[in-house]
């Protein structure tokens, strides 16, 4: 099938676009998924759908609270965080009977709403009495990438006077550079860690407290109670750090699926609670469609099938390029969401694609050369708004023309001229167009990718909701740290031992 020219598939089927595109309505806006510039055909799609015919039960099981995270014996209920009935109740519409899990979600959303109101009114003050208006999120992985990406993507909706910063790296430079930009008297720090024992997060929180002590001249307990908020499921551990304001996390929500919860507190404070709710509503709309539609009408399944097809035909990576400055960090968010979810042992042998990417049109002047003429097989995914959030029509037209030119150029190539001037074409692209970047459409796109990841995991026989690979590096890092601090005397490979020796020489 890979020998078939994509452009010939268009020539032989006038209805190809209709058959291989899906449109998802999100309130007044929409998202358009175009899989037609791939090698997919209806026959290929139907072949995969036949293998997925029992996935409906698995999908219902997730929404119903079955323990589909089988390695940890946990429910997978990030969908409950944006449950339609929960959101209706938060807005004061009706009083549905919620199950225990969704009742906890509702209670926490109301708690977030109240805190945002206190923040807006100036009732959240620091040790000097100044209103806190600078939000600093301290977390790593899912406690950082999701909120960081959303705050960046929704910059157009950010509220005047509210600033957001993110600290994740254990390299102290990350924290120090943030402190160089902020007024510590007006800064609120949100420490996000489910266990509240994540090394990078806790050490960064401790460094932030130490720097605040120096700058504000107050003791740590007062600083912690006034300038810090925790998001965690381990209240006892939070208490050891004198942080009194605690928001909940639950075992049924994994970090990379958690931005819809109090993990997204930085989002709610930055864009306001109403816009945070709009984000959740967009995701909720996709949840409804995903659960209701099966087979060819399920956009997430078709998206998964495209990736499965190329994975089984020798592709090992996917390049995501967003032609939208606001979406610059989207591929980084998906990098974790996809690779941590499906980059593990598989019953079928295959695992998820390597995810990388960048920002259009910048990337056209960096790595697109390889995409057009390189020997590596790359599945390219392009995202683009149909309406911009600015009034400069000329510039948006240039963005659109570049995005469409790349997808067409990768497909048709150029056969004339010398070998150096020739482009073989027949390179697949998936194009995702959204009518306009709003909280709803962003939420809908994130939910779409979450569900696509789930479908891929089901097909490969992977539990997409645990992350055992994270623990090995942590264990070895602890051993090396003990050696550095003269608390251990382990034998290492010659390479590691030599680098440790060099480190010792530099410290003398």
Swiss-Prot record:
Pathway: Carbohydrate degradation; glycolysis; D-glyceraldehyde 3-phosphate and glycerone phosphate from D-glucose: step 2/4. The active site is at 340 (proton donor), 365, 474. InterPro entries: G6P_Isomerase, G6P_Isomerase_C, Phosphoglucose_isomerase_CS, SIS_dom_sf, SIS_PGI_1, SIS_PGI_2. One of its GO terms (biological process) is glycolytic process. Keywords: Cytoplasm, Gluconeogenesis, Glycolysis, Isomerase. The keyword Heme does not apply. Its main location: cytoplasm. It catalyses: alpha-D-glucose 6-phosphate = beta-D-fructose 6-phosphate. The keyword Cytoplasm applies. It comes from the Eukaryota. GO terms for cellular component: cytosol. Its EC number is 5.3.1.9. Pfam families: PGI. D-glucose 6-phosphate binds at residues 142-143, 193-198, 336, 340, 365, 474. Belongs to the GPI family. Homodimer. In the cytoplasm, catalyzes the conversion of glucose-6-phosphate to fructose-6-phosphate, the second step in glycolysis, and the reverse reaction during gluconeogenesis. This is Probable glucose-6-phosphate isomerase. It comes from Encephalitozoon cuniculi (strain GB-M1) (Microsporidian parasite).
């Amino acid at each position: 099938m890979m020998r078939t020219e994509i452009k010939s598939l268009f020539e032989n089927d006038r209805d190809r676009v209709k058959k291989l595109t899906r449109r998802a309505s999100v309130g007044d806006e929409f998202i358009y998924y175009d899989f037609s510039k791939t090698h997919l055909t209806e026959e290929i799609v139907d072949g995969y759908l036949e293998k997925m015919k029992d996935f409906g039960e698995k999908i219902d099981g997730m929404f119903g609270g079955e323990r589909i995270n089988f390695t940890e014996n946990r429910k997978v209920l990030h969908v409950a965080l944006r449950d339609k009935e929960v959101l209706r109740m938060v807005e004061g519409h009706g009083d549905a009977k919620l199950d225990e899990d969704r009742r906890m979600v509702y209670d926490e959303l109301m708690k977030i709403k109240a805190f945002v109101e206190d923040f807006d009114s100036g009732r959240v003050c620091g040790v000097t009495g100044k209103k806190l208006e600078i939000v600093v999120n301290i977390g790593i992985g899912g406690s950082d990438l999701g909120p960081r990406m959303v705050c960046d993507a929704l910059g157009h909706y950010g509220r005047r006077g509210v600033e957001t910063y993110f600290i994740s790296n254990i390299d102290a430079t990350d924290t120090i550079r943030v402190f160089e930009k902020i007024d510590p008297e007006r800064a609120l720090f949100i420490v996000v860690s489910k266990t509240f024992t994540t090394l990078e997060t806790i050490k960064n929180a401790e460094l932030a407290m130490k720097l605040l002590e120096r700058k504000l001249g107050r003791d740590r307990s007062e600083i912690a109670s006034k300038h810090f908020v925790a998001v965690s499921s381990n209240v006892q551990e939070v208490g050891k750090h004198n942080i009194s304001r605690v928001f909940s996390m639950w075992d049924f929500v994994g970090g990379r699926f958690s931005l819809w919860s109090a993990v997204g507190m930085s989002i709610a404070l930055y864009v306001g609670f109403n816009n945070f709710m709009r984000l959740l509503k967009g995701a909720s709309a996709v949840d409804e469609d995903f659960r209701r539609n099966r087979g060819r009408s399920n956009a997430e399944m078709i998206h998964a099938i495209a990736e499965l097809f190329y994975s089984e035909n020798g592709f090992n990576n996917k390049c995501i390029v967003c032609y939208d400055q606001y979406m610059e960090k989207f591929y980084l968010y998906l990098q974790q969401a996809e690779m941590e979810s499906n980059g593990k042992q598989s019953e079928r042998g295959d695992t998820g694609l390597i995810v990388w990417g960048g920002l259009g049109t910048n990337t056209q002047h960096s790595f697109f050369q390889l995409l057009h003429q390189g020997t590596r097989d790359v599945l390219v995914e392009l995202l683009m708004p149909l309406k911009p959030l600015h009034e400069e029509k000329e510039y948006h037209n240039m963005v659109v023309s570049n995005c469409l030119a790349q997808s067409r150029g990768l497909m048709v190539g150029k056969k004339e001229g010398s070998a150096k001037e020739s482009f073989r074409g027949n390179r697949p692209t998936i194009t995702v167009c959204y009518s306009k970047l709003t909280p709803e459409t962003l939420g809908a796109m994130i939910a779409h990718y979450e569900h696509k990841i789930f479908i891929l995991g089901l097909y490969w026989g992977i539990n997409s909701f645990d992350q055992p690979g994270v623990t090995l590096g942590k264990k070895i890092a602890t051993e090396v740290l003990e050696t550095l601090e003269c608390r251990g005397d382990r034998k290492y490979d010659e390479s590691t031992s030599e680098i440790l020796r060099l480190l010792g020489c530099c410290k003398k």
